[in-house]
């Protein structure tokens, strides 16, 4: 086999070049060819004898053993058909990830256009993002995506954010943009997942169960009914298959980064910039931007949640550029004089802050609620007791960043920065 060369594209962005996965496949093919030629065993171990060898190595009385393959990563990628992989943190710990490829919003809704914002960081498009296959568990100060563990809970947003960033550059707490990118794909594929929404089982189908961390039986309403990550059936995966992302619906709510409301005003971090290691996501950060209800452009907020002309949630009424609803699919444009324009709604739809189809039933009654005072951060997905209100589009905007409920966890993600 001839040596495979990676197409690096056009500098400085790499436009037109190979994706991360394609480039990795070429490197792996080159490695496989080389080590086969050198006589590597099937397990990928190359033993160099005591004399000068084809590698040009002269060893002493011992043998030189070179471990050439990451068997865990290879096994995960092989079993998942390349949709999952294993990344390693700053401390060398494994974290399991699903690879989500870049897509255009027109593939979700023909009336929308442009690359989904989850795939844009500092104005540069990314070919893929990596989403934790499992809800996160903090181990050694790092937020990891691991199978068959109880997800960490009862921890505030800041602690989860710190643990996610401790994994190294590119590792982060899942952003609202990333969550939305996955949720919209679920919708497009007609695969809105079920999950642990009734004390260890699905509220929609009691035969779909997971293994409760407290050891009690599914459906027993006593105890804290968190299930072990990924222990449910394929119906609890985002694509309905074993290689999907687990537990996006139910089990524990998940903190999302990069979005908030402040006194009801919707504010976001541009695109997927919330994935950056050093970006300021604090309450007083100047990175927070409001959304102009006429143009959809990001604008600097006034600091009190009353910025003129920006989109705000409301508890009712018909004030300019306000939206509200009793569940996610029921959120509607309220104003009769200055409704949010189509251009501005397009931004909200991409971020799953407004239904991209105004049809309540299309979103299975997924939950929506908010608190209209002070800063409130989003949690998504629902918990083990939310029943039919839990789901991939469920959005709850009532928690302060200091909140520590037992029903809230988090999920790690990664972008190659």
Regions found by a protein language model. Give the residues of each.
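Fibrous stalk/shaft segments of extracellular and virion attachment machinery
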Residues: 1-63
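Structured alpha-helical subdomains that flank or immediately precede key functional sites
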Residues: 62-79
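Extracellular adhesion/carbohydrate-recognition regions
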Residues: 74-171, 264-322, 376, 409
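Short aromatic-cysteine micro-motif
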Residues: 114-247, 279, 341
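Short secondary-structure boundary/capping segments
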Residues: 187-192, 260, 269-272
């Amino acid at each position: 086999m001839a040596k495979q060369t990676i197409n690096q594209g056009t500098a400085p962005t790499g436009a037109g070049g190979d994706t991360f996965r394609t480039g990795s496949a070429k490197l792996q093919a080159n490695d496989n060819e080389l080590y086969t030629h050198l006589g590597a065993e099937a397990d990928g171990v190359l033993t160099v004898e005591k004399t000068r060898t084809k590698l040009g190595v002269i060893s002493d009385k011992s043998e030189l053993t070179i471990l050439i393959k990451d068997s865990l990563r290879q096994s995960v990628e092989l079993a998942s058909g390349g949709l999952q992989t294993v990344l390693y943190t700053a401390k060398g710990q494994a974290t399991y990830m699903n690879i989500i490829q870049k897509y255009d919003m027109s593939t979700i809704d023909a009336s929308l256009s442009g690359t989904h914002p989850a795939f844009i960081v500092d104005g540069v498009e990314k070919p893929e993002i990596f989403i934790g296959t499992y809800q996160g568990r903090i181990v050694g100060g790092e937020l990891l995506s691991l199978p068959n563990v109880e997800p960490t809970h009862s921890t505030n947003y800041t602690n989860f954010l710190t643990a996610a960033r401790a994994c190294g550059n590119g590792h982060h707490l899942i952003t609202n943009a990333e969550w939305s990118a996955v949720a919209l794909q679920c919708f497009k594929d007609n695969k809105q997942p079920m999950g642990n929404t009734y004390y260890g089982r699905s509220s929609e189908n009691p035969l779909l169960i997971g293994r409760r961390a407290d050891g009690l039986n599914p459906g027993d309403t006593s105890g804290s009914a968190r299930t072990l990550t990924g222990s449910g059936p394929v119906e609890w995966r985002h694509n309905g298959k074993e290689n999907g992302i687990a537990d996006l619906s139910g089990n524990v709510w998940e903190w999302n980064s990069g979005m908030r409301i402040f006194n009801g005003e919707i504010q976001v971090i541009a695109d997927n910039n919330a994935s950056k290691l050093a970006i300021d996501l604090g309450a007083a950060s100047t990175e927070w931007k409001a959304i102009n209800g006429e143009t959809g452009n990001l604008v600097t907020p006034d600091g009190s949640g009353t910025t003129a002309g920006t989109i705000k949630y409301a508890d009712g009424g018909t004030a300019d550029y306000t939206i509200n609803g009793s569940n996610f699919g029921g959120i509607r444009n309220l104003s009769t004089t200055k409704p949010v324009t189509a251009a501005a709604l397009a931004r909200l739809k991409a971020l799953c802050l407004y239904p991209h189809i105004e049809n309540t039933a299309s979103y299975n009654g997924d939950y929506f609620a908010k608190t209209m005072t002070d800063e409130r951060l989003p949690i998504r997905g629902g918990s083990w007791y939310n029943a039919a209100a839990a789901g991939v589009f469920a959005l709850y905007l009532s928690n302060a960043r200091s909140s520590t409920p037992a029903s809230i966890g988090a999920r790690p993600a990664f972008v190659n920065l």
